[in-house]
Amino acid sequence: MVEKTERIWMDGELVPWDEAKVHVLTHSLHYGLGVFEGIRCYALQQGGSAIFRLEEHIERLFQSAHIATLPMPYTQAQIAEACLETVRVNGLDSCYLR
């Protein structure tokens, strides 16, 4: 079950949960073509959190997009920063990122 957060990273910016929508004619909805990664973020005993193997997950995401001939509109560094910022802005310490 998905837990509602304050903000979701979408199209390069953090938007309120209720505003994160895709159009009904979105290509991936019509044709089922897309790539994604599931990434765990864990709470640390000393406080804060760590995203498990973030760089490796992002590299695999880009490899998958390349194989599927899907253009990536962001750099790997931008995706990594988006993951970190999403966790921080939502005050999460343990979560699952997609």
Residue ranges and their predicted role:
Residues M1-R98:
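Conserved alpha/beta cores of soluble small-molecule-handling proteins
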